[in-house]
Amino acid sequence: MIVKFPNQPPELDYGNREYKRLLKLCNRKSFESKATQMLYRIYEGNGHALYLVGIDANGRVTRIKYPELTETIECLREISRIIDATIKKINIYRVDDTSYVSTLRITKEI
């Protein structure tokens, strides 16, 4: 089913929300940088972070193809493993015939 996923407010430098247009499988150094960022968002949310995939930093829905979405989710899984965090819930929204956005709830005991 196609849903209307609204644009979001611009991403803030603080808080537990992180927007990602997409992530490509990348090297260890890049993973470590993203892991530090994820840990920061989790701490800002007292153990909980919300990642929105397919959303630019300005909050606009960018609509990514399904293979890019699954690659981004897999990158986030690997990053969460690095910091011993858990992806608790993944929601995938089809926003048109070929494009998607996703939300991921990530938690860690702090």
Q: How would you label these PLM feature ranges?
A:
Residues 1-110:
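Polybasic/polar functional segments that serve as interface/processing modules
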